[in-house]
């Protein structure tokens, strides 16, 4: 792999998206939001009436979708077939649906090469859960972000409320813990850090502090 790739992995709510968008803007790199691809695919399946347990039909659907990401400051706009679906894919339900389809090998296979195709001569920030272990195992720089379930719940509640969604702390905390258990124990590509990833715990750090630590680490591998 000749193109410079930086992977940012970790569970939901740790700040992967914000860090990835910030790094893409500061470094002038392209951006891949892997989690959004799964959410977009689940949304498309829902709209077309495809069941979330129909592995074959889900795998057939994915290659037909036109997906792109537009990074603006610390925000990422997700586009599906020319439509801005950012708001639709950020709901709690969309996240649950994405985890449901992510367990299927054929679905992951259908998306794997597509994600690798995001690699760019300008450089790439790849945000996801298995970017450093499966999608870009040879990436030059790898991060794995962590944060407590309680802190992630606080962030998620605030995010949902700011977007106009109802949010219950207890329900979201339970959902996060359930997703964590499912993602870490699933048979196909469980959520684990790459062996050569730098672990960043953002529980008690501001996003500015996380970005600063990430940039300092990246500078060890690439001069800008």
Curated annotation (Swiss-Prot):
It comes from the Bacteria. Its main location: cytoplasm. This is Cytidylate kinase. NCBIfam families: cmk. One of its GO terms (biological process) is pyrimidine nucleotide metabolic process. Pfam families: Cytidylate_kin (PF02224). Its EC number is 2.7.4.25. It comes from Haemophilus ducreyi (strain 35000HP / ATCC 700724). It catalyses: CMP + ATP = CDP + ADP; dCMP + ATP = dCDP + ADP. It is found in: Cytoplasm. Coiled coil: none annotated. ATP binds at residues 10-18. Belongs to the cytidylate kinase family. Type 1 subfamily. GO terms for molecular function: ATP binding; CMP kinase activity; dCMP kinase activity. InterPro entries: Cytidylate_kin, Cytidylate_kinase_dom, P-loop_NTPase. It is an enzyme of class 2 (transferase). Keywords: ATP-binding, Cytoplasm, Kinase, Nucleotide-binding, Transferase. One of its GO terms (cellular component) is cytoplasm.
């Amino acid at each position: 792999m000749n193109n410079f790739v930086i992977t940012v992995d970790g569970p939901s709510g740790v700040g992967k998206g914000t860090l990835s968008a910030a790094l893409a803007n500061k470094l002038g790199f392209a951006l891949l939001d892997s989690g959004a691809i799964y959410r977009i695919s689940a949304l498309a399946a829902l709209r077309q009436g495809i069941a979330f347990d129909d592995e074959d039909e889900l795998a057939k659907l994915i290659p037909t979708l036109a997906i792109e990401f537009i990074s603006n400051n610390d925000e990422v706009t997700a586009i599906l077939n020319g439509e801005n679906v950012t708001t639709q894919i950020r709901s709690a339900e969309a996240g649950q649906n994405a985890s449901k389809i992510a367990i299927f090998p054929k679905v992951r296979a259908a998306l794997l090469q597509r994600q690798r195709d995001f690699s760019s001569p300008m450089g790439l920030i790849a945000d996801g859960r298995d970017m450093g272990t499966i999608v870009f195992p040879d990436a030059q720089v790898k991060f794995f972000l962590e944060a407590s379930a309680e802190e992630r719940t606080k962030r998620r509640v605030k995010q949902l409320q700011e977007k106009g969604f109802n949010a219950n702390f207890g329900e979201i905390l339970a959902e996060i813990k359930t997703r964590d258990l499912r993602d870490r124990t699933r048979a196909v590509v469980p959520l684990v850090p790459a062996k050569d990833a730098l672990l960043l715990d953002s529980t008690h750090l501001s996003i500015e502090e996380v970005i600063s630590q990430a940039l300092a680490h990246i500078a060890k591998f690439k001069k800008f």
